[in-house]
Amino acid sequence: MMLPLPTPRALLIAAGALVVAGLLGAGGWYWHTVAARHAMAAYADAMTRAQPALGPQATAETRAAGIRELEAALTQYPSGPGAAEVAYQLGNLRYEAQQYAQARGAWELAVAQGAPQTLRVLSLSGVAYAWEAERNYAKAVDAFKVALTGLGPKDFYYEELLLGLGRAQELAGQKADATATYRRALSELTHSRRLEEIRARLAALGA
């Protein structure tokens, strides 16, 4: 069985608390300027209004309303403190709505806005998942490689990204590369709970 693609809900759950904490932290750093206060107020208001869209039972209409709220805040303050967090959450909502190109755009904006390391990794992983969801596996492979740049086995989300790379390589027909990636995972992720999955993928590849 192919290693599973994370669901949109899993992406949201992975960083819900992180986004709120990051937004509040950004406010502490930038609160000394009037423009920053206005930006933070707009972001906080938009995030509050968008909360119903983040729930597991959100309807398409609720999600669309949340997207509008976050986009309006980013349009008004495209580079204020906390913009990366808002853009990341916008990407999640776009992904949930299966608007994959727009989701990538939002996550790329989060990275461009100087997202902190954890949020940056999540945003880059989202770009890869969006390509994968569109079945553009070659692009997904490239995106996973970008997301893995500079990371090691002890870093946040490294395991998910490395296994995502292997999965995308399989789906792209890059059998030799996928085999190498899974072997790398076995050697680097020695305490992973997914070792049997990895071995199963190698066996399926004839390795």
Regions from the language model: what does each represent?
Residues 74-83, 97, 113-120, 148-157, ...:
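Short solvent-exposed coil/turn linkers within tandem alpha-helical repeat scaffolds
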Residues 37, 42, 62, 78, ...:
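Structural signature of alpha-solenoid helical repeat junctions
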Residues 1-20:
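N-terminal positive-inside, membrane-proximal cytosolic segments immediately preceding the first
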